[in-house]
């Protein structure tokens, strides 16, 4: 979901209203994409996977992004509401990993959570600056966007919590998310609708409706498949040992970096 949200920010940059908008969205995109690559690198190291495999070697069905980000924003108000909900949801899950029995994972999520604090400040500022017309657009967009955000917390089984990899349970992450919705309700001057249970078939592992995937157009934007894009892409390595080392010496783990220690 961070991967997709980062591309949302990249796409929306030209629609910013001021230079601070442009710079903040560029910084937020950089954070989301950088954090995504750090997480993928961590997983590849932890499970001895080929380098870059998780970014470039998966199909659309393998991407477990939140349904909230499937549909592009129809207007500025819709974008601001969606960005608020996505940032709040991601923060609520990241906070749940702080204090994990896996120290490296805990440190990484704590750092990401701290960086996300500034994202939420930016989004709060956008909400406060909405015109009356934009506020009405945001109010119109909120019910469906909020329903999708809430559904994302339906984890199905909660093995990560049971094994103390994530100290917070799924319900605690959801409660943290709900507590943060006050700023949204205040900015839009309305009450929040009650949560409704998802009535369709739900895939708890992917946290999406059963059989669904992000739209093909969005996937093409996130990971272009054109010949030109693939030519410009760094080729996949069969293993980390296949990477070219310009200094002709083996790679060493950076002992000063705490986030990837096991």
Model-derived segments and their meaning:
Residues 3, 30-37, 84-88, 110, ...:
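Generic structural signal for well-ordered, non-transmembrane alpha-helical segments
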Residues 5-27, 89-106:
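Helix-loop segments that flank and shape redox-cofactor active sites
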Residues 22, 26-29, 73-84, 106, ...:
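Amphipathic, non-membrane alpha-helical segments in soluble helical-bundle scaffolds
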Residues 28-57, 123-128:
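Conserved alpha-helical segments that form or flank metal/cofactor-binding pockets of metalloenzymes
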Residues 56-83, 100, 133-134, 145, ...:
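Acidic/His metal-coordination segments adjacent to aromatic residues that form catalytic metal sites
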Residues 68-122:
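Internal, conserved structured core segments that host functional sites
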Residues 107, 119, 124-128, 132-140:
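Charged, well-structured binding/catalytic surfaces in domain cores that contact anionic ligands
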Residues 137-262:
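Extended, helix-rich structural scaffolds rather than catalytic motifs
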């Amino acid at each position: 979901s961070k991967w997709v949200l980062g591309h949302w920010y990249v796409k929306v940059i030209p629609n910013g209203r001021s230079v601070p908008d442009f710079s903040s969205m560029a910084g937020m995109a950089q954070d989301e994409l950088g954090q995504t690559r750090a997480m993928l690198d961590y997983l590849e190291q932890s499970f001895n996977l080929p380098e870059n495999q998780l970014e470039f070697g998966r199909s659309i069905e393998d991407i477990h992004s939140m349904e909230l980000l499937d549909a592009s924003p129809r207007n500025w108000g819709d974008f601001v509401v969606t960005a608020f909900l996505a940032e709040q949801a991601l923060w609520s899950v990241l906070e749940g990993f702080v204090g994990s029995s896996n120290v490296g994972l805990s440190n990484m999520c704590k750092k990401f959570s701290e960086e996300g604090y500034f994202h939420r400040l930016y989004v709060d500022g956008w909400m406060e600056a909405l015109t009356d017309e934009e506020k009405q657009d945001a109010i119109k967009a909120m019910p469906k966007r909020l329903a999708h955000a809430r559904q994302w917390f339906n984890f199905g089984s909660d093995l990560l919590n049971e094994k103390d990899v994530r100290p917070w349970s799924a319900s605690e992450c959801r409660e943290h998310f709900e507590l943060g919705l006050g700023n949204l309700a205040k900015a839009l001057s309305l009450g929040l609708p009650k949560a409704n249970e998802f009535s369709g078939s739900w895939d708890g592992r992917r946290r999406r409706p059963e059989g669904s995937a992000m739209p093909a157009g969005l996937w093409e934007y996130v990971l272009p498949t054109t010949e030109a894009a693939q030519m410009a892409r760094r080729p996949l390595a069969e293993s980390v040992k296949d990477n070219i080392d310009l200094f002709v010496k083996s790679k060493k783990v950076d002992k000063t970096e705490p986030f990837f220690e096991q």
